[in-house]
From Swiss-Prot:
SUPFAM superfamilies: Nqo5-like. It catalyses: a plastoquinone + NADH + (n+1) H(+)(in) = a plastoquinol + NAD(+) + n H(+)(out); a plastoquinone + NADPH + (n+1) H(+)(in) = a plastoquinol + NADP(+) + n H(+)(out). NDH is composed of at least 16 different subunits, 5 of which are encoded in the nucleus. Its EC number is 7.1.1.-. It comes from Eucalyptus globulus subsp. globulus (Tasmanian blue gum). It is a peripheral membrane protein. This is NAD(P)H-quinone oxidoreductase subunit J, chloroplastic. It holds the Pfam family Complex1_30kDa. It is found in: Plastid, Chloroplast thylakoid membrane. Keywords: Chloroplast, Membrane, NAD, NADP, Plastid, Plastoquinone, Quinone, Thylakoid, Translocase, Transport. It comes from the Eukaryota.
């Protein structure tokens, strides 16, 4: 079933794939990395003025990485604002996705966390560096194929 935003994107010739609706009835769309920046700008102009959250996950061992964006249209006098979930998949070998920092400033720390944990590079992000792990950390801890370093000391329980 195609949602309202998906129908609008089709009408305007914008390439995407509808993934249906989540359990709350929020429309979910898949956008290719090369199309994401231009569609993000269009969504902002269309009224999706709030990036509620951005996260990322490892789809499967050796598979794709996903960056997920939850956008909301906040309008005066509207009790139930329209929401959409956008998923952008990137190859594990060189995961690059355009940053939306310049569209929604709230993407700053969220994209940095996704970079730090999964190694997704957000092109044009002004400060893309580790935010949780030390700068010297090797690897991406939330990837399913991550092998934890063998240097942790077991602390005495006393």
């Amino acid at each position: 079933m195609q949602g309202r935003l998906s129908a609008w994107l089709v009408k305007h010739g914008l390439v995407h794939r509808s993934l249906g609706f989540d359990y709350q009835g929020i429309e979910t769309l898949q956008i290719k990395p090369e199309d994401w920046h231009s569609i993000a700008v269009i969504l902002y102009v269309y009224g999706y003025n709030y990036l509620r959250s951005q996260c990322a996950y490892d789809v499967a061992p050796g598979g794709l990485l996903a960056s997920v964006y939850h956008l909301t249209r906040i309008e005066y006098g509207v009790d139930q604002p329209e929401e959409v979930c956008i998923k952008v998949f990137a190859p594990r070998r060189n995961p690059r996705i355009p940053s939306v920092f310049w569209i929604w400033k709230s993407a700053d720390f969220q994209e940095r966390e996704s970079y730090d944990m999964l190694g997704i590079c957000y092109d044009t992000h002004p400060r893309l560096k580790r935010i949780l792990m030390p700068e010297t950390w090797i690897g991406w801890p939330l990837r399913k194929d991550y092998i934890a370093p063998n240097f942790y000391e077991i602390q005495d329980a006393h």
